[in-house]
C-alpha cells in the first residue's frame, strides 16, 4: 500500500508520478490499496479481493454505480465524503471476518453476506463476465442476472 500512511498532498504527488510513469513507459501497474476512492480516481480496472480471492473486477469509472458483489457494494457504501448527503447511512459489515488461516469452504464472504445461500457454503463461485470488463464471483448475482435476463 504505497500511499496508506501518507499525507493527502503527498499521496496525490505519488499518484501523479505513478500515472505519469505509466503513460511515459507504457506499462501496466498493480496498485494494492484499501482506499477505494483513491483507486477509483486513477485506475482503469479494479480487482476487489476478499480473503485472498478476487470477488469482482470492474472498470474504475464504474465501481461506484455498477458494483454488484455484496463485498464491493459494502466497500462503496462505507465510503465517507464531505459532499455526501448527511442523511445517507454509512454502510458497515456487521460480523467479523474469518481468519485468513481458516477460510471457510465455499464463498469466502459467506458468513458476512446478507444474501448467503446453501450453494455459497459448499462451492466457490467462479468469476463470470456480466458486462464488458466486469466480472463477479457470486451465486446471488448469478441468480439475479438470470431473473432479469441481462446485466446492468
Residue ranges of predicted features:
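P-loop NTP-binding/switch modules centered on Walker-like glycine-rich loops
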Residues: 1-88
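Charged, flexible cofactor/metal-binding loops and thiol motifs
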Residues: 58-152
Amino acid at each position: 500500500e504505497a500511499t496508506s500512511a501518507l499525507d493527502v498532498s503527498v499521496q496525490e504527488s505519488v499518484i501523479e508520478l505513478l500515472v505519469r510513469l505509466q503513460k511515459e513507459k507504457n506499462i501496466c501497474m498493480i496498485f494494492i490499496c484499501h482506499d477505494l476512492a483513491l483507486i477509483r480516481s486513477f485506475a482503469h480496472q479494479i480487482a476487489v479481493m476478499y480473503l485472498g480471492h478476487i470477488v469482482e473486477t470492474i472498470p474504475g469509472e464504474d465501481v461506484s454505480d455498477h458494483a454488484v458483489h455484496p463485498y464491493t457494494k459494502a466497500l462503496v457504501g462505507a465510503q465517507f465524503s464531505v459532499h455526501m448527503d448527511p442523511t445517507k447511512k454509512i454502510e458497515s459489515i456487521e460480523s467479523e471476518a474469518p481468519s485468513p488461516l481458516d477460510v471457510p469452504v465455499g464463498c469466502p464472504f459467506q458468513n458476512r453476506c446478507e444474501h448467503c445461500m446453501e450453494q455459497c457454503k459448499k462451492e466457490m463461485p467462479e468469476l463470470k463476465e456480466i458486462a464488458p470488463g466486469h466480472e463477479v464471483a457470486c451465486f446471488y448475482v448469478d441468480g439475479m442476472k438470470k431473473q432479469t435476463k441481462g446485466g446492468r
